[in-house]
Amino acid sequence: MNQSLLSEFGTPEQRVTHAIEALRAGRGVMVLDDEDRENEGDMIFAAETMTVEQMALTIRHGSGIVCLCLNEERLEQLDLPMMVQNNTSAYGTGFTVTIEAAEGVTTGVSATDRLTTIRAAIADDARPSDLNRPGHVFPLRARSGGVLTRGGHTEATLDLVTLAGFKPAGVLCELTNDDGSMAHAPEVIVFARQHDMPVVTIEDLVSYRRSRETLQAS
């Protein structure tokens, strides 16, 4: 990642700290991956604090594929199988079957309905019967170990929301340009400025976690 593009958002460590602080304050964060990977920016939010207004923003400016990042334990609690048994996608993105809240939604498409589905899925006492399948929310399985295991937006989302003190459940959606093309770093930075979001890279988060976990182990 071209670090000069991100200099206004601080050093790599500061960018992670700012992202954690933003999530704690109920704001969203823009997460960039490597230019040699997907080269995309995702809007991410803590699932516990996401508002209808933030969901509407996500749908309006994103790809439309609103994903709920969860760990293996939660997926087992909800009895959500993987979408396919043989995952041949380029980066092994862990899609499960899609979901809809069993109660409290209409078509499931609106910002309110999608947020209702997310809240049903992350409730402490959530059961498989609380969700219908298929639906309009796309759960993603995060790998154990987070970004130190897999450098994806899914793992970055769960790492950031847990570092911020929330349960391991985060919402992500890829940012798109007005013409429907994928937003890359320059467009992500403009969007972040407009919507008061910090920008952090997955590389930043990997370095942050390694440095702290090395200190804790010493």
Swiss-Prot record:
Mg(2+) 2 binds at residues 38, 153. InterPro entries: DHBP_synth_RibB-like_a/b_dom, DHBP_synthase_RibB. GO terms for biological process: riboflavin biosynthetic process. Keywords: Lyase, Magnesium, Manganese, Metal-binding, Riboflavin biosynthesis. Mg(2+) 1 binds at residue 38. This is 3,4-dihydroxy-2-butanone 4-phosphate synthase. Pathway: Cofactor biosynthesis; riboflavin biosynthesis; 2-hydroxy-3-oxobutyl phosphate from D-ribulose 5-phosphate: step 1/1. Pfam families: DHBP_synthase (PF00926). Belongs to the DHBP synthase family. SUPFAM superfamilies: YrdC/RibB. It is an enzyme of class 4 (lyase). It comes from Erwinia tasmaniensis (strain DSM 17950 / CFBP 7177 / CIP 109463 / NCPPB 4357 / Et1/99). The record marks 136, 174 as: Essential for catalytic activity. It catalyses: D-ribulose 5-phosphate = (2S)-2-hydroxy-3-oxobutyl phosphate + formate + H(+). GO terms for molecular function: 3,4-dihydroxy-2-butanone-4-phosphate synthase activity; magnesium ion binding; manganese ion binding. GO terms for cellular component: cytosol. Its EC number is 4.1.99.12. Catalyzes the conversion of D-ribulose 5-phosphate to formate and 3,4-dihydroxy-2-butanone 4-phosphate. D-ribulose 5-phosphate binds at residues 37-38, 42, 150-154, 174. Its cofactor is Mg(2+); Mn(2+). Homodimer. Binds 2 divalent metal cations per subunit. Magnesium or manganese.
